[in-house]
Amino acid sequence: TRELLHLVTEGIEDYEFLNWKSQVFGVEGNGGDCAYSNSYIQEGAKVNARAYIEDSYLYGETHIAEQCVVSGVTLKDKIVPAGVTLHGLKLRNGKFVVRVYGTFDNPKGFLADDAPFLHTTMKQMPELLGLSVEEIWGAEEPYLWFAKMYPVCDSIEEAVTAALELVEVLAGRQKVSENYKNAQRMSLYESFNAADTTQMLAWQENLEKKIRISRFLKAIDERKEVAEAALS
């Protein structure tokens, strides 16, 4: 994740000879400088220039801070703190999970090494989450990759809310809820393997259509060549 963020926000100039761009097919209502790909960022949503948005729809008073990566989610009136990555997945059972972690965290982080995670460390996680080591890792080795932290939700909006609440809990700014402790939770590993790639592709295609229509209407409104609407 950190390598991707660096490439699209700072290192893209090194690849200009390949015609690579930091903004690839999207709508940015504020005309900002953030990096994005196949994303719709409505006017009013603010994204730091050192953030990257992918396959996402941002609207309302959404604010994305620096060094964030946001992928596969819908955000309305949400604040994503600096250095946080959100990655939304639709599962094969029709449910949703939003994985959240620090942009510079290592999924291979190990409990015994007290590896950093978001605003805390892995040894502090059980107390902050109100869960035992066994409840978080079960029979798996205690790597971050296997930690069951992400609630399974009925909608992407609920999953986003749950993910951002997890950020607040691990930062010590909010107490963990009983709903969280009692929820079905998945790890990075489990959610990756349970993802419905067909539905994720459908979401990307529907978002692309929305972007294309918006660019088409904007081109007409600004009296530009309509062909520009199809350009990335």
Model feature map: region roles:
Residues 1-232:
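Left-handed beta-helix
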